[in-house]
């Protein structure tokens, strides 16, 4: 399946028929894959797959996004582009994030779950408090 075919398939699940072209166009432009957008995904590098996946997830306006380290994708120019779009989505949506970037977590999160050694789970109303617990737990 090519990048375009994948985007078309997913778009059929999450958008109206008259929005299909706009979704495909958004992902094609945003991901900056060029000719690779029409090539099989199995030929993509991990970075290309991440760009396609991030662009595809951002093509839809959801109430909640599940985010796993995706903001670290690509070169500096692409990261800035992701950050601008992320900020836009953050104004109208919520994020459930997994990240090793403390700055990203502090920027986008209002509360935190910290899963420590032995799978101990703790909820924190303060992201800063969760980060301190993480650092303490990791000996940082």
Q: Can you describe what each PLM-predicted range is?
A:
Residues 37, 60-61, 90-92, 108:
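Short loop/turn elements that form and flank the Walker-type P-loop nucleotide-binding site
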Residues 85-97:
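Conserved catalytic loops of ABC-family nucleotide-binding domains
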Residues 118-140:
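Conserved beta-strand-loop-alpha-helix hinge in the C-terminal portion
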Residues 1-52, 56-76, 84:
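ABC-family P-loop ATPase nucleotide-binding domains
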Residues 107-114:
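Conserved catalytic segment of ABC-fold P-loop ATPases
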Residues 101-107:
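Conserved H-loop
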